Amino acid sequence: MIFTRLTRFVGHGTGLRLYATAEKSSLATLRKKTGYTFANCKKALEMHNNDLAKAEQWLQEQAQAMGWSKATKLEGRNTTQGLIGIMVKNNIGAMVEVNCETDFVARNQSFQKFVQAASTACVRYMDQIEGDANLTKVGLNSESLKQIKLEDGKSLADHLALMIGTVGENASLNRAICFKAPESINLTGYVHPAPTEEVPLDVPQFGKYGSILAFKHTSADSNGEVAKKVCQHVVGMKPAKIGDKTRDEPAKDKDDETCLIYQEYLADPSYTVAEVLEANNVEVVDFQRFECGEKIKMDDETVRAVN
């Protein structure tokens, strides 16, 4: 009889330990997956009988509601800092500006991940737009950007509110420019500061400055290296337009030059950009430059409504 009681006691204790271990494992998994606090993850699991899927859904719903509440309270506070995000995938390129209040938040991982998500969402949006034989260029203002959907079906506005709730600071989707190129035209992009390690352009990158260049080239620049350097030049030298030799005259003072083709080439000032392009059989079709915090509104004529 004593043996029977002892067996029952040991068996019951083992069961408790196994349950406690499973509970800790679920808690660790949920914490790692969502990034939410230990207390909130524990509460979610307790409310849903240790069901991970239901607990995660509840946490996301709570975070979304808190994010919208936080975003509403912080709305109107100046957002002069932030990042420029760029992604170029095959024949589609997107550049987006996301702003926040401080440079501290701009370095926050949650904010940076949102910038990457916004860049990816713009590429997906542009992929759904029918292109033609010419370069298609679409500008998106703040309201249009907010409507764009991510893969999870939620809008960028929803994800923005969620991010605001996480970082505790106001943030805003400012603008984006998207390109869709036919086979005859190539795209490249550049952000500054550039990543410390080389990253493929189809992986979203971010920095304080960015540019996208649409170009045509021949075998002389088969890997697009010259075009990449010109894209970097656009960030550094801030040209206002490509320029046309039949209509535009070089500026009297080289420091005042705003035509890309007449500017001294950033990588080698002994040449002009036009000379470098001609020597390598590269033709610039279009370009766009963003600087974080610059006071430039998206031209309404380029804005296309998001369906």
Curated annotation (Swiss-Prot):
InterPro entries: EF-Ts_dimer_sf, Transl_elong_EFTs/EF1B, Transl_elong_EFTs/EF1B_dimer, Transl_elong_Ts_CS, UBA-like_sf. Disulfide bonds: none annotated. Residues 1-19 form a transit peptide. It is found in: Mitochondrion. One of its GO terms (molecular function) is translation elongation factor activity. It comes from the Eukaryota. GO terms for biological process: mitochondrial translational elongation. Signal peptide: none annotated. GO terms for cellular component: mitochondrion. Keywords: Elongation factor, Mitochondrion, Protein biosynthesis, Transit peptide. Belongs to the EF-Ts family. NCBIfam families: tsf. Associates with the EF-Tu.GDP complex and induces the exchange of GDP to GTP. It remains bound to the aminoacyl-tRNA.EF-Tu.GTP complex up to the GTP hydrolysis stage on the ribosome. This is Elongation factor Ts, mitochondrial. It comes from Aedes aegypti (Yellowfever mosquito).
